[in-house]
Amino acid sequence: KKISIANDGGALTNDAGMVLVAEFLKKIHFDQLLNERIYINDGRKFSHHSWLEILKQWLYQLIAGYSRDRDANKVQYDRLFQEALQQENLSSQSMLSTFLHTLTTENVSQLSQVAKDLADLWLDHDNTQHLVLDFDSTACPTYGEQEEAEFIYHYGINGYHPFVTFEGLTGLALDVRHRHGKSYTSTHAEDYLEEMLDRYQQRSSDPLIMVRGDSGFAKPEIFAHCEDRQVRYVIKLKSNARLLDHIQHQVLYQDDTDYTKTEQQYFLMDYRANKWRQSRRVAMKATRFAGSLLFSDFQFIVTNFENLDPKTIFQLYQKRGNMENFIKEMKGGFFAEKTDSTSFTANQARLALSFMAYNIIHLMKHLTFPSTEKATVIDTIRFKLFHIAGRMTAHARQIQIHLSNTNVYDTLFWDVLARIQRLNL
């Protein structure tokens, strides 16, 4: 038989699973959090949507995977989105654009604070005493005449150079700051660190906090902040003539060496750079690659751990590799690298909204997903749980959502929904 296709199926939704997000946000009292944290000046007359309603629609679109602003022109007619957001009519692209360009720098800080509060919800729920602050920077490319965009030599592109901090044990985003393209990796990092230490050291009488960062964060100000506040750190150092001379005199070449295998040797030394106020402990690793006669790769990590051997120090640092996955998830999964607006403040707001959406889903995974699904990335979550065909019907006392009965991940959907409904924060 011939197959004919027509776009006349009626008011169906491809995102019936987004009801999980709606239920989860109710459970964590998200509306209350927005009302407490965010105030956006509204001089409009005869407006149909509050700014916070538009903000929530933006978050839903990000979470559902709609990265383009113009997607709102279709989403606004989706019955599932209307019911989830409890709005009879949703906003179009033009209204979302108006909202974005209404936001001030203070509003951006408020958005970021909500994202931080979401991370704190998990830390409070889990009564976390151990925190790993993973510092990094990333690039958000620009392709037009955006304000504050500059050429970033490290990445070889024009764009912005945000500072990011993730909690290394959970993957929650703790801080995300847009910066202009000329910003160095560690620009203002010591100030951001001090803010985070003020925040998290007040949460517990004796928290165990560790800071990790690459060589871009090897600043004496960062070391001093950590030392003065009893915070541990493992931060990579760039090699220099003094360090290389020392380690090259330490490596051992033995007669029974198997040169067909890679060999690594570890050492410790006390080292003081010219700008440091004191000497510090430096772990060193020398690597001779298989097939080579000489050690040719040397790495250095400065730390204030006193009783750890150098190999363990390197193992602690190497776990920072998860950071790249967290950044990739926020940028690729929640569109944090979008810089479509000419205004720097508007692009700051875009990043802050992605920061918030990322933490909503990360918190949802930690609190309501079965253990086998907690590491799932957002693209897979959308495929398994959110992008489900459905139809909505209105009755006198309730709205019913009819899900496809051929959903392969039906069991997972109902499991997560039950976990959300049992959630008590």
Predicted regions and their residues:
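Short acidic (Asp/Glu) and glycine-rich catalytic loops that position anionic groups and cofactors
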Residues: 1-3, 34-38, 77-79, 293-298, ...
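An anionic, glycine-rich sequence signature occurring as long contiguous blocks
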Residues: 1-3, 7, 232-332, 415-425
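Dynamic "connector" segments at or just before major functional cores
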Residues: 1-184, 189-203, 388-425
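Short amphipathic alpha-helical "interface-anchor" segments enriched in bulky aromatics
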Residues: 24, 72, 310-349, 353, ...
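Basic, amphipathic alpha-helical segments enriched in Lys/Arg and hydrophobic/aromatic residues
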Residues: 55, 336-402
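Short, glycine-/Ser/Thr-/acidic-enriched flexible segments
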Residues: 138-140, 170, 179-181, 240, ...
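Domain-level cores of phosphate- or acyl-group-handling catalytic modules
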Residues: 183-242
